[in-house]
Amino acid sequence: MARTIEGMLTDPGGRFAIVAARFNAFIVERLVAGCDDALRRHGIDTESRLDIVWVPGAIELPMICQRLAASGDYTAVIALGAVIRGSTSHYDYVCSVAAKGVADASRDTGVPVIFGVLTTDSIEQAIERAGTKAGNNGAKAGLAAVEMASLIRALES
């Protein structure tokens, strides 16, 4: 029988960081609150073990995520933001740069860096994903961080 290794939704220990994009702050603040709540519900004392770093926008997320993950101070880093489609191709560029950069930060450092950036066609969709009809994607990102950090710990033991 094959051995199964998976992360758990229990406190893996260590510190966590949220890197939040200030652009569309009225949405992102809800994502940050949802993430904080999810971490607390899973045993992380966010008063002492969570740092929240604000950057101007989604394009700036990867650089700070990379820096925090490479510092060795964090068990997981969570990137949160909201990119809402406009009438130009700028949306596609921002989404692509942010997603690839966050993935690269995780791969390059070996630290879970979770992509919790909303990429929506409308403000209404963003609001739905920030805590109304579609749940809170910030909370989902927080859970992914806990599970991935737990999985990394399991793989190292």
Question: Which residues does each predicted region cover?
Answer:
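Amphipathic, non-transmembrane alpha-helical secondary structure
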Residues: E29, A33, P62-Q66, A70, ...
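Short, ordered loop/turn segments at secondary-structure junctions
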Residues: R22-F23, G81-V83, L118-S122
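Generic structural signal for well-ordered, non-membrane alpha-helical segments
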Residues: L9, N24, V28, A58-L61, ...
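Short beta-strand segments at enzyme active-site cores
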Residues: I52, T75-L80, P112-L118
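Glycine-rich oxoanion-binding loops at beta->alpha junctions
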Residues: V53-S71, V117-L118, S122-I123
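Glycine-rich phosphate-binding loop
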Residues: E60-V102, S157
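Glycine-rich phosphate/diphosphate-binding loop of Rossmann-like nucleotide-binding domains
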Residues: T4-P56
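C-terminal binding/interaction regions
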Residues: I5, Y91-D92, S96-S157
